[in-house]
Protein backbone atom coordinates (compact mmCIF):
# COMPACT_ATOMS: atom_id res chain seq x y z
CA UNK A 1 0.00 0.00 0.00
CA UNK A 2 1.34 3.40 -0.95
CA UNK A 3 1.71 5.99 1.79
CA UNK A 4 2.36 8.98 -0.45
CA UNK A 5 -0.65 10.03 -2.43
CA UNK A 6 -0.13 10.61 -6.13
CA UNK A 7 -1.61 13.33 -8.27
CA UNK A 8 -3.23 12.04 -11.43
CA UNK A 9 -4.15 13.44 -14.81
CA UNK A 10 -7.32 11.51 -15.71
CA UNK A 11 -7.62 11.61 -19.49
CA UNK A 12 -10.38 10.56 -21.82
CA UNK A 13 -9.02 8.66 -24.84
CA UNK A 14 -11.02 9.51 -27.97
CA UNK A 15 -10.64 13.17 -28.88
CA UNK A 16 -7.98 13.75 -26.22
CA UNK A 17 -5.22 11.17 -26.86
CA UNK A 18 -6.28 10.17 -30.36
CA UNK A 19 -8.23 11.95 -33.07
CA UNK A 20 -11.93 11.24 -32.88
CA UNK A 21 -12.93 8.24 -35.00
CA UNK A 22 -16.35 6.85 -34.18
CA UNK A 23 -15.93 3.43 -32.59
CA UNK A 24 -12.16 3.31 -33.05
CA UNK A 25 -10.85 -0.24 -32.75
CA UNK A 26 -8.23 -0.64 -35.51
CA UNK A 27 -4.58 0.32 -35.10
CA UNK A 28 -4.46 1.70 -38.64
CA UNK A 29 -7.20 4.22 -37.74
CA UNK A 30 -5.39 5.47 -34.61
CA UNK A 31 -3.81 8.92 -34.91
CA UNK A 32 -2.63 11.12 -32.03
CA UNK A 33 -4.24 14.52 -31.54
CA UNK A 34 -2.27 17.70 -32.13
CA UNK A 35 0.59 18.14 -29.62
CA UNK A 36 -0.57 15.08 -27.66
CA UNK A 37 2.86 13.53 -27.08
CA UNK A 38 4.60 16.75 -26.05
CA UNK A 39 1.64 17.58 -23.80
CA UNK A 40 1.68 14.15 -22.14
CA UNK A 41 5.44 14.39 -21.53
CA UNK A 42 5.06 17.83 -19.97
CA UNK A 43 2.18 16.64 -17.76
CA UNK A 44 4.35 13.72 -16.58
CA UNK A 45 7.28 16.11 -16.00
CA UNK A 46 5.00 18.17 -13.74
CA UNK A 47 4.61 15.10 -11.50
CA UNK A 48 1.27 13.74 -12.67
CA UNK A 49 0.64 10.05 -13.21
CA UNK A 50 -1.55 9.43 -16.25
CA UNK A 51 -4.69 7.32 -16.07
CA UNK A 52 -6.93 6.97 -19.11
CA UNK A 53 -10.68 6.58 -18.54
CA UNK A 54 -12.71 5.78 -21.64
CA UNK A 55 -16.30 4.86 -22.49
CA UNK A 56 -16.27 2.05 -25.06
CA UNK A 57 -19.94 1.62 -26.00
CA UNK A 58 -18.88 -0.01 -29.28
CA UNK A 59 -18.26 -3.24 -27.35
CA UNK A 60 -21.85 -3.41 -26.03
CA UNK A 61 -23.15 -2.32 -29.43
CA UNK A 62 -21.32 -5.22 -31.10
CA UNK A 63 -19.14 -3.01 -33.33
CA UNK A 64 -15.96 -4.58 -31.96
CA UNK A 65 -14.99 -7.09 -29.29
CA UNK A 66 -13.28 -6.74 -25.93
CA UNK A 67 -10.29 -8.50 -27.51
CA UNK A 68 -10.11 -5.95 -30.36
CA UNK A 69 -10.34 -3.13 -27.82
CA UNK A 70 -7.52 -4.69 -25.77
CA UNK A 71 -5.26 -5.18 -28.81
CA UNK A 72 -5.57 -1.48 -29.69
CA UNK A 73 -5.06 -0.50 -26.04
CA UNK A 74 -1.91 -2.61 -25.72
CA UNK A 75 -0.60 -1.16 -28.99
CA UNK A 76 -1.03 2.53 -28.13
CA UNK A 77 0.15 2.03 -24.54
CA UNK A 78 3.37 0.45 -25.85
CA UNK A 79 3.67 3.12 -28.54
CA UNK A 80 3.38 5.87 -25.94
CA UNK A 81 5.99 4.12 -23.76
CA UNK A 82 8.38 4.00 -26.75
CA UNK A 83 7.77 7.74 -27.20
CA UNK A 84 8.68 8.35 -23.55
CA UNK A 85 5.21 8.49 -21.97
CA UNK A 86 4.32 5.99 -19.26
CA UNK A 87 0.64 5.41 -18.60
CA UNK A 88 -0.09 4.29 -15.03
CA UNK A 89 -3.37 2.58 -15.93
CA UNK A 90 -6.31 2.46 -18.32
CA UNK A 91 -9.93 1.93 -17.27
CA UNK A 92 -12.75 1.41 -19.73
CA UNK A 93 -16.50 1.01 -19.60
CA UNK A 94 -17.82 -1.53 -22.15
CA UNK A 95 -21.48 -0.95 -21.25
CA UNK A 96 -24.24 0.80 -23.13
CA UNK A 97 -27.94 0.73 -22.17
CA UNK A 98 -29.15 0.05 -25.73
CA UNK A 99 -26.42 -2.37 -26.78
CA UNK A 100 -26.88 -5.73 -28.48
CA UNK A 101 -24.50 -7.76 -26.26
CA UNK A 102 -26.90 -8.80 -23.46
CA UNK A 103 -24.43 -8.89 -20.54
CA UNK A 104 -23.11 -5.42 -21.45
CA UNK A 105 -26.42 -3.76 -22.32
CA UNK A 106 -27.21 -2.01 -19.08
CA UNK A 107 -26.99 1.19 -17.12
CA UNK A 108 -23.86 1.14 -15.02
CA UNK A 109 -21.89 3.29 -12.63
CA UNK A 110 -18.66 3.18 -14.62
CA UNK A 111 -19.96 4.90 -17.76
CA UNK A 112 -19.22 8.63 -17.81
CA UNK A 113 -20.78 11.00 -16.74
CA UNK A 114 -20.83 8.72 -13.66
CA UNK A 115 -17.51 8.78 -11.78
CA UNK A 116 -17.16 4.98 -11.55
CA UNK A 117 -13.87 4.62 -13.44
CA UNK A 118 -12.28 7.38 -11.34
CA UNK A 119 -13.50 5.64 -8.20
CA UNK A 120 -12.07 2.32 -9.46
CA UNK A 121 -8.71 4.07 -9.83
CA UNK A 122 -8.99 5.51 -6.32
CA UNK A 123 -9.57 2.02 -4.92
CA UNK A 124 -6.50 0.69 -6.74
CA UNK A 125 -4.13 3.62 -6.12
CA UNK A 126 -3.56 6.16 -3.36
CA UNK A 127 -4.69 9.28 -5.25
CA UNK A 128 -4.75 12.87 -4.06
CA UNK A 129 -7.98 13.78 -5.84
CA UNK A 130 -7.76 17.48 -4.91
CA UNK A 131 -4.38 17.77 -6.68
CA UNK A 132 -5.54 15.78 -9.69
CA UNK A 133 -6.95 17.02 -12.99
CA UNK A 134 -9.29 15.64 -15.64
CA UNK A 135 -9.15 16.23 -19.39
CA UNK A 136 -12.01 15.35 -21.71
CA UNK A 137 -13.60 16.46 -24.96
CA UNK A 138 -17.25 16.14 -23.87
CA UNK A 139 -19.29 17.54 -21.03
CA UNK A 140 -19.92 13.95 -19.85
CA UNK A 141 -16.17 13.69 -19.12
CA UNK A 142 -16.26 16.94 -17.16
CA UNK A 143 -19.32 15.82 -15.17
CA UNK A 144 -17.52 12.58 -14.19
CA UNK A 145 -14.58 14.60 -12.89
CA UNK A 146 -16.79 17.00 -10.98
CA UNK A 147 -18.77 14.15 -9.41
CA UNK A 148 -15.50 12.53 -8.31
CA UNK A 149 -14.37 15.76 -6.62
CA UNK A 150 -11.65 16.74 -9.11
CA UNK A 151 -11.32 20.53 -8.81
CA UNK A 152 -9.77 21.28 -12.23
CA UNK A 153 -11.43 19.78 -15.30
CA UNK A 154 -10.31 20.77 -18.79
CA UNK A 155 -12.33 20.52 -22.00
CA UNK A 156 -10.10 20.21 -25.07
CA UNK A 157 -11.05 21.33 -28.56
CA UNK A 158 -9.29 18.36 -30.21
CA UNK A 159 -12.34 16.08 -30.06
CA UNK A 160 -16.10 16.54 -30.24
CA UNK A 161 -17.07 20.16 -30.80
CA UNK A 162 -18.82 21.48 -27.70
CA UNK A 163 -20.98 24.54 -28.15
CA UNK A 164 -21.86 24.92 -24.48
CA UNK A 165 -19.05 23.83 -22.15
CA UNK A 166 -20.04 23.23 -18.55
CA UNK A 167 -19.73 26.17 -16.22
CA UNK A 168 -16.67 24.83 -14.36
CA UNK A 169 -14.75 23.44 -17.34
CA UNK A 170 -11.56 25.17 -18.43
CA UNK A 171 -11.55 25.31 -22.24
CA UNK A 172 -8.20 24.56 -23.87
CA UNK A 173 -6.85 23.85 -27.35
CA UNK A 174 -4.95 20.61 -26.62
CA UNK A 175 -2.94 18.67 -24.03
CA UNK A 176 0.11 20.87 -24.51
CA UNK A 177 -1.78 24.08 -23.71
CA UNK A 178 -3.20 22.34 -20.63
CA UNK A 179 0.33 21.43 -19.53
CA UNK A 180 1.21 25.14 -19.70
CA UNK A 181 -1.87 26.06 -17.63
CA UNK A 182 -1.03 23.64 -14.80
CA UNK A 183 2.69 24.40 -14.40
UniProtKB/Swiss-Prot annotation:
Places the protein is found: Cytoplasm
EC primary class: hydrolase
Protein's pathway: Nucleotide-sugar biosynthesis; GDP-D-glycero-alpha-D-manno-heptose biosynthesis; GDP-D-glycero-alpha-D-manno-heptose from D-glycero-alpha-D-manno-heptose 7-phosphate: step 2/3
Biological processes annotated in GO: carbohydrate metabolic process
Enzyme Commission number(s): 3.1.3.83
CDD domains assigned to the protein according to its UniProt record, in alphabetical order: HAD_HisB-N (cd07503)
Alphabetically ordered keywords of this record: Carbohydrate metabolism, Cytoplasm, Hydrolase, Metal-binding, Zinc
InterPro entries per record: HAD-like_sf, HAD-SF_hydro_IIIA, HAD_sf, Heptose_bisP_phosphatase, Histidinol-phos
Residue numbers binding Zn(2+): 93, 95, 108, 110
Reactions accelerated catalytically: D-glycero-alpha-D-manno-heptose 1,7-bisphosphate + H2O = D-glycero-alpha-D-manno-heptose 1-phosphate + phosphate
Pfam families linked to this entry: Hydrolase_like (PF13242)
Cellular component terms per the entry's GO annotation: cytoplasm
GO molecular function, one term: metal ion binding
Family under the similarity heading: Belongs to the GmhB family.
Name this protein carries in UniProt: D-glycero-alpha-D-manno-heptose-1,7-bisphosphate 7-phosphatase
Organism this protein belongs to: Photorhabdus laumondii subsp. laumondii (strain DSM 15139 / CIP 105565 / TT01)
Organism taxonomic ancestry: Bacteria, Pseudomonadati, Pseudomonadota, Gammaproteobacteria, Enterobacterales
Gene that this sequence comes from: gmhB2
Amino acid sequence: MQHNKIKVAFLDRDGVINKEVNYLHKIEDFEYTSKCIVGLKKIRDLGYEIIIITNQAGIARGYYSEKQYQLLTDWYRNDLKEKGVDILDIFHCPHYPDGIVPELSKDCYCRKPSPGMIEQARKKYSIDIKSSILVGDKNSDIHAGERAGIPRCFLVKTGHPTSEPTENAILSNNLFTISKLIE
